[in-house]
Amino acid sequence: MNVPEINLIAQNLKELFAEKQRDFASKSQEIDATFIKRLMDTEKKAYCKEEFDAKLNKLKEKIENFKKYGLTPSIVIPNGYPEELQKVLSLYIDDMEAKMAVFDVFYNQLAVFDSMISDKALSNKKILLNDNNGIVVVNDNDDRIPLNKLSSGEQNLIILYYKLVFSIRKNDLLLIDEPENSLHAAWLTKMLDDYLDMADRLQCQIII
């Protein structure tokens, strides 16, 4: 039995979520293994309160952004900055920044993909991206719609943008055959603009 391409795309994204979670766990283990040694390093200085607060606020903002796609792991946010714990907390905040950086590129890809699809207004539907299903589409009542029940145009739109955002790399050559197939005319101009923008960012060639 042939699996619809839209379902394969969703499964692929689900696997990417799992891969990034494994990367985060591996990076966390690597960093945590040297925590005591680095804490005892006399050359490591603590941040002043202003620096610490700035870093903490930036970390909180990143965590809130990541929550949208379920990327945020269990994190304890320091409450206060007591003098006797300044070095420990300074090291902790640095470590959390390094751990969360594992998700940076993937989060940006998710955000771009989400934005591109959402801008196309999928006939009173919205797209959700998460680690459980990869891609989920729901209607205005938040009822889930099977991906293979979307119109052919909507499926093609999701597939094309997924390949654009997650498959091509810098200096790649991307060939797109009949992009107008089943797509609403109103989507085409914006889609071409998005493709040109991505080609410029990645310095790649797109042949349509």
Question: What is the meaning of each model-derived region?
Answer:
Residues 11, 21, 29, 86, ...:
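Residue-identity detector for glutamine
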Residues 4, 46, 83, 90, ...:
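Short, well-ordered helical secondary-structure segments
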Residues 10, 18, 25, 33, ...:
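A sequence-composition feature that detects small, non-aromatic residues
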Residues 102-208:
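Switch/communication elements of ASCE P-loop NTPase nucleotide-binding domains
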Residues 33-53, 83-97, 122-132:
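Short, charge-rich amphipathic segments
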Residues 1-81:
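Electropositive, glycine-dotted interaction segments
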Residues 51, 60-113:
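Charged, surface-exposed helical/loop "interaction arms" that form contiguous linear patches used
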